């Protein structure tokens, strides 16, 4: 009887140790970045849906707005993040200077390459530009007496979290100057344009993170 209890006690200890070890297994960097990009995709889609509903009189649909890419001629995400077999101007892209040196956890050692480093650096710069624009627009929206719409805090947090994973350099982000007394109609139209452009870019980011986290 005593021996049976002792064996049961040992088995319980082994099980508890196994469960404890399972809890503390850290999520790999690429997997964490994928989770963050998926969260960003969800919160961005939610924000686009909210904008379409609340700004239905502003023609805030993808087919009605004038599409504008604020990252054009400033980053090379679309070129650098192409599959390696499709790269035609790798040497040209490689000579471009990037203002971000990736020190984050999204790039696994087995997939490290010059082009992927450029890709993640460009993604970081994209997020930084959109973050700055969204902060300025949100401040303008909140300053209006009738707060018809403001940016979803969850989306802004998702941008910040992925940026921190992409770059651990401790860079201080500079906020864009407030828009001041901007016309409410123009502010909301700019919000629609930015949201649709950002949604498209987030899809690209999510595909990259899917690739990096795959075995």
From Swiss-Prot:
Name under which the protein is recorded: Interleukin-12 subunit alpha
PANTHER family: INTERLEUKIN-12 SUBUNIT ALPHA (PTHR48485:SF1), INTERLEUKIN-12 SUBUNIT BETA-RELATED (PTHR48485)
The organism's place on the tree of life at top rank: Eukaryota
SUPFAM superfamilies: 4-helical cytokines
Glycosylation sites: 35, 89, 167
Family: Belongs to the IL-6 superfamily.
Entry-linked InterPro entries: 4_helix_cytokine-like_core, IL-12, IL-12_alpha
Disulfide bonds: 33-106, 60-192, 81-119
GO molecular function (one): protein heterodimerization activity
KW Phosphoprotein (keyword) present: no
Function of the protein: Heterodimerizes with IL12B to form the IL-12 cytokine or with EBI3/IL27B to form the IL-35 cytokine. IL-12 is primarily produced by professional antigen-presenting cells (APCs) such as B-cells and dendritic cells (DCs) as well as macrophages and granulocytes and regulates T-cell and natural killer-cell responses, induces the production of interferon-gamma (IFN-gamma), favors the differentiation of T-helper 1 (Th1) cells and is an important link between innate resistance and adaptive immunity.
């Amino acid at each position: 009887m005593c021996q049976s209890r002792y064996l049961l006690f040992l088995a319980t200890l082994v099980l508890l140790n196994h469960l404890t070890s399972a809890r503390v297994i850290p999520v790999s960097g690429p997997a964490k970045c994928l989770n963050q990009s998926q969260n960003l995709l969800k919160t961005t889609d939610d924000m686009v849906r909210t904008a379409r509903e609340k700004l239905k009189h502003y023609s805030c649909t993808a087919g009605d707005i004038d599409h504008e890419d604020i990252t054009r001629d400033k980053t090379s995400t679309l070129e650098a993040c192409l599959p390696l077999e499709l790269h035609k101007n790798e040497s040209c892209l490689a000579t471009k200077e990037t203002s971000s040196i990736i020190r984050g956890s999204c790039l696994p050692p087995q997939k490290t390459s010059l082009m992927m480093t450029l890709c993640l650096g460009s993604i970081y710069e994209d997020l930084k530009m959109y973050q700055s624009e969204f902060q300025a627009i949100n401040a303008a929206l909140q300053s209006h007496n009738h707060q018809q719409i403001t940016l979803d805090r969850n989306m802004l947090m998702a941008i910040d979290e992925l940026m921190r994973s992409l770059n651990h350099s401790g860079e201080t982000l500079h906020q864009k100057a407030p828009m001041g007394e901007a016309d409410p109609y123009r502010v909301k139209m700019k919000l629609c344009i930015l949201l649709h452009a950002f949604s498209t870019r987030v899809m690209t980011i999510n595909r990259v993170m899917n690739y990096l986290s795959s075995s």
